[in-house]
A protein has these predicted regions:
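Active-site phosphate-binding and catalytic loops of NTP-dependent enzymes
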Residues: 30-33, 73, 96, 110-115, ...
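Peripheral, non-AAA+ core regions of ATP-driven protein-machinery
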Residues: 1-72, 76-79, 184
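Walker A/P-loop
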Residues: 72-113, 178
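The Walker A (P-loop) glycine that initiates the GxxxxGKT/S ATP-binding motif of P-loop NTPases
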Residues: 75, 138, 160
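Basic, amphipathic alpha-helical bundle interface domains used for macromolecular binding and assembly
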Residues: 143, 166-304
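Walker B catalytic acidic pair
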Residues: 153, 159-161, 171
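Conserved alpha-helical scaffold flanking the Walker A/P-loop in AAA+ ATPase domains
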Residues: 62, 117-123, 134-156, 189
Length: 304
């Protein structure tokens, strides 16, 4: 793991003779280097190029990644909501050195760190809707970090959001606002970091096909109204982008569009957007549109 630590040159030695050689003739000792950008090797397994017929959804992901915005996607089953969400880390900037250390410490405290491992890629966490409150926000006998802290500096994907108990979703209010979560345990309280991009996904109704042009919805108006009120207003107020994700057509599924944006294309747009924000907010305590206070919008942004 030492070769990942900045300002330290690490050498490997199989025998004591290798160590003696290093001490006597260090210039002759070969240093093995490791490609620091290990994100690409991991993220290349999934790519936005695989997502067909969802250019609007991809555009929303670019905006979310560039401005650090929370997103809610609404669409029927099979429309591609999960594919859009799970590829978001592929277009986020690499973790800085400080972020790598912080993320590694979090996973170490949670007991999820493998031996001699330094986490170098953005976390992606996708808890199931049956997850307990303690597993989401943290807690238990040892006050371990929960999913929202394990997603720190990465992505928290809440799939089938209306299926989560309302009190579990409402527990996201504090971290979405302050990027921290306080876990109370007996006589002590613990503050854990929870700075992530939150992606909520939901069907438009219990059966999943309200408004779908290809399949008729069978939900009653009462069921529909009850379903649409499962997510509280304070949570929705903290979501920046809302998009409707329609099921791609049969032709979209068959034809691989050469003009469809790949993760590499989208990452370039994200990097350009983040650079523009750094220049715009160079003298401000915040550095992204997602952190922009309401009172500063008219002053710092041209919205005419």
């Amino acid at each position: 793991m030492l070769h990942n630590i900045e300002a330290i040159t690490s050498y490997g030695a199989h025998t004591l003779a290798d160590i003696v050689k290093l001490v006597i003739r260090p210039d002759e000792y070969r240093v093995d280097t490791v490609d620091d950008d290990c994100n690409d090797a991991v993220n290349s397994l999934i790519d936005y190029k695989d997502v067909q017929g969802q250019e609007l959804g991809k555009r929303a992901m670019v905006i979310a990644a560039a401005g650090v915005h929370h997103v809610m996607m609404i669409g029927p089953p099979g429309s591609g909501k999960t594919m859009l969400a799970e590829r978001l880390p592929t277009i986020l900037p690499p973790l800085s050195w400080e972020e790598r250390l912080e993320t590694t410490r979090i996973h170490d405290v949670a007991g999820l760190l493998e031996k001699n491992t330094l986490i170098a890629k953005r976390p992606f966490r996708c808890p199931h809707h049956t997850a307990t409150l303690a597993s989401i926000i943290g807690g238990g006998s040892n006050a371990k970090p929960g999913e929202i802290t394990l997603a720190h500096k990465g992505v928290l994907f809440i799939d089938e959001a209306p299926e989560f108990p309302r009190y579990v979703l409402d527990a996201l209010r504090q971290p979405l606002e302050s990027h921290m979560i306080t876990v109370n345990r007996l006589q002590n309280s613990y503050d854990y970091p929870a700075d992530f991009i939150c992606i909520l996904a939901a069907n438009p109704c219990p059966c999943g096909y309200y408004g779908d042009p290809h399949k008729e919805c069978v939900c009653s108006s009462t069921e529909l109204e009850r379903y649409q009120h499962k997510i509280s207003g304070p949570i929705l107020d903290r979501i920046d982008l809302f998009i409707l994700v329609e099921r791609p057509s049969f032709n979209d599924m068959l034809c691989m569009d050469s003009d469809s944006m790949s993760s590499a294309d989208m990452k370039q747009l994200v990097e350009k957007g983040r650079q523009m924000q750094l220049e715009r907010f160079h003298d401000q305590p915040f550095k992204s549109n997602g952190a922009l206070p309401h009172g500063a919008i008219r002053e710092l942004c041209n919205i005419r």
